[in-house]
């Protein structure tokens, strides 16, 4: 199975490399060439999921608006690029060029005041480079005629500073000039002249590195300090766990194996893991569901590895519109073959039939919760008129991808797993017909305590880095340190495996042979802590409103559910290898 998974991973890496090559910008311009500036969306600063189309607000517009043709990933990302009245020709400076003269009605003014109070920002794209700006500002309270007042201003002048190298655009920044503000504190109609300026400057920076400016935030001293403490915290937990494992294997378990193998009768009489050798490999309950979890968890693990490969090759950089979501759709579809292959391979070791049920369950285990949550969130977005609402055509495309590509790949993996998968499982000892009765357990061997500990230890080692990830996903901090993220993920895998092995050994030492499902729960429960921390993160943030709350909880649930399946699978596989090793090392009668 390892060779099959390696082959699939190689195909994915080749595909992601091809995707990344196609995503690069290679636009060349001559002086005076028109370079279109597209307006994208607007929204409150603290609610990243609550965005609306640019022209939903009473900005300058003239005639029909041309919508830019977008990719699937851009639509899923909530991008809605449209043409604008801004004319930024290559290497052509402009000073106080009139964009439009607009009469703001009382309703327009009320709308602007409302969005300015919520710190609305706008986003634009120029030669695939993002730029932002604020709509207006609120000035401090003042007292007049015994009443408290607040001043609202709208920015009427926008400055563009563009850097170029030879015939390519390298960087663009926008500045809302505070010298040109219009007071809209009163509900009276007002005429506003919107203007803009453009200045071009030569730079020595190459076009290949023009996106690096969006990564510099990750190397801010404060960010580096947080990463350092996260690294130190992870290393501390890993070292402590390595010491515990060394004690377990080098002293306690090794002595048990030696004494049991040489026929020490006193050792044989002791209660412990040795007494359940004829039950520990008994076919677990709900084998189809267990194999489906293993298949889906392995699929998602391969997908995560492929994403890291994309990040390290530089194809997943900040604000590369839709690249991440496009990659996720393609890679999840292709890795469905892994889910079918893995679930069938494990199922065939215990039962010679009913593998089809495992494949079907693997096909719905993650997609069904995903589509349910997506449908609810899409309904909420449609109600609010947000750009996160998926058009009908996009929904049809997603359904077609799932039915015409995802399901066939899943079935193909099931066929390959049935024919070329793992051989029938041969336990080191014969399995008794009747299961051994499980004696009463001490409190530290009970399921609740073990599952809690199995989730808490790995989470405590990565909590600082997990906070940074939340801040990147739901704030405006840029997480572009794939090396640190990969290190954190490796630590998470190591701790989930190690803690799973230790807890499985403790469970078997209490003569409790039903370890299969508990090992999955112990590993996956880390994701429950992650979701709980996500709720705490939301409560401490400035996010508000039902739309943002629903998207935050929904997407966080999907992320943590995926990690539950991945970490549960890792914990199970580590426990399975450990159990096979210790029972093969014993000379059973």
UniProtKB/Swiss-Prot annotation:
Gene Ontology CC terms, in alphabetical order: endosome membrane; Golgi membrane
Tissue: Expressed in the root cap and in giant cells.
Record GO biological process: response to nematode
Transmembrane segments: 228-248, 292-312, 322-342, 362-382, 395-415, 451-471, 483-503, 519-539, 551-571
Region forming the signal peptide: 1-24
Keywords noted in UniProt: Endosome, Golgi apparatus, Membrane, Signal, Transmembrane, Transmembrane helix
Location of this chain's protein in the cell: Endosome membrane; Golgi apparatus membrane
Family annotation (Pfam families): EMP70
Disulfide bonds: none
Motif stretch (Golgi retention signal): 587-589
Motif (Endoplasmic reticulum export signal): 578-583
Residues in compartment: Cytoplasmic: 249-291, 343-361, 416-450, 504-518, 572-589
Membrane topology classification: Multi-pass membrane protein
Stretches of the chain found on the membrane's Lumenal side: 25-227, 313-321, 383-394, 472-482, 540-550
Up-regulation conditions: Up-regulated upon nematode infection.
Annotated family: Belongs to the nonaspanin (TM9SF) (TC 9.A.2) family.
Domain-related comment: The C-terminal KXD/E motif functions as a Golgi retention signal, certainly through the binding to the COP1 coatomer.
Name recorded for this polypeptide: Transmembrane 9 superfamily member 5
